Amino acid sequence: MQFFNLNAGEWAGALEEIQQKAGYRFNDLGRLRLALTHSSYASENPSSPEWNERLEFLGDAVLELLVSRRLFDALPDVQEGTLTRNRSALVDEHANAGYARTLGLDRAILLGKSECRDGGRKRDSLLGDAFEAFLGAVYLDGGIEAAERVLAPLLPPVKDVSDNASKANPKGALQ
């Protein structure tokens, strides 16, 4: 199997590192592999007919739920609009790409040759999608509690998020 910029041993090491950083060991490594398989890789490798977009769909919902619950519990006196802005700051493309980099997903995602050449490993949109797929895989493998344990250490303190959301929307902070 060709991994484009990674040999099989390096990829196995990257998967191990991801699990260590996430504090979660997959029961089914196939889920982790699928979460890290980009459509460009699958289209070039008939032995990998599936890619991570369905897991991305699921992971997006899991991420929104967990972040919403965290904000709801931590900010009991805050109105819905502010909660929504805070959630948006925690689940946007840039934030998700940061979580992906923290876990080392950028080193392990399987990309097609052209996507790899074009810098896909550095692109926030691709990495953010990979993080959502990863979280979806954790959810399927270990449940919502496992997904929450993986996500919690990646998120900044709620106060920091709330302060930054107010600065980004000063008119809303005054209302």
Where is each model-derived feature located?
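Double-stranded RNA-binding/processing signature
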Residues: 1-175
